[in-house]
Amino acid sequence: MTGLWIQPTGAALAADVHGVDLSQPVNDEVFARIAEAWAEHLVLRFSGQKLDDRMLMQFSARFGELDRVPISAASLDRADSDVIDEAREWVAVIASVKKDGKAIGSLGNYELVWHTDMSYNELPPRASLLYSLEVPAHGGNTGFLNMYCLLYTSPSPRD
């Protein structure tokens, strides 16, 4: 067993995961502990990881079959983009960076409104993984909501 340990944030959800290098294949025993922590805490943060797209895809696939990135599946015009790598079918790049005048990702400097990833699908994905390479000093926050707490603490419609 590795030195894997889980540190709850103390908030309504989330925990930090320490002692695992996601750039390497994660064995079944370690993944079982990660999956258990995810079921308990709903959001897991793995700080200090150095991953490329393939590594991210490999770890993500442990949670289930990967879904195509909506923008690449529906509307990405490859002739207008540097996005030619097969990984772009599975890994969404959200960036304001341009290379040779072409965006390397989607959304640019725009903020997303509050949403649940791909909730418009009849069978939404089991999980979403976010890997940040560069985050601004101010802003760039990602929020999470514990819908179980909302469900169990909200008044009944009959109240």
Features from the language model and the residues they span:
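Non-heme Fe(II)-dependent double-stranded beta-helix
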Residues: 2-142
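Flexible glycine-rich active-site/ligand-binding loops centered on an Asp-His dyad
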Residues: 146-150
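Conserved small/polar residues in nucleotide/adenosyl-binding loops
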Residues: 152-159
